[in-house]
Amino acid sequence: MRYTHCPDCGQRLSARPIGDEGLVPWCESCRRPWFDTFSTCIITAVMNEKGEVLLQRETRRPDREVLVAGYIKPGESAEDAARREIREETGLTATTLRYMGSWPHMEGNMLMLGFAATAEGEPSPDSSEILSDRWATMEDAVRSLREGSIAQQVVMAIRDHK
């Protein structure tokens, strides 16, 4: 989000050069910069003991398969958010969790932190967000996820790291 008015005093911001940052929204009244903000989210490829990836269909987009994803709550670490989202969206408990990298999602004004997780058992989501899920081989997951999507990039990063 790009600020146009100061969140503290409401004054319209001006652009001021700040070091290597270039022009930054600046409040003359509060004498401080307001850097652009974005949401930080997790996206996790949950895998079973066979190395299969859990693909899900959400109620809001039933035509597309996705990975477990969600927003990080205030005071929550990225790892805790990944474990929480896995529990909420699959009913599974992550036995391992490995950070894979970060991907900017410009359309959603988000930074996605990617993880690989392993879990045992079969998914039983307790979420109204999830329509269905299935286990897929790594290659089937790459083919099934939207071309160029962050989900596809996370799965390819896991595949290529082995």
Positions of PLM-derived features:
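Short connector loops at helix/strand junctions that flank enzyme active sites
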Residues: 22, 37-41, 62, 67, ...
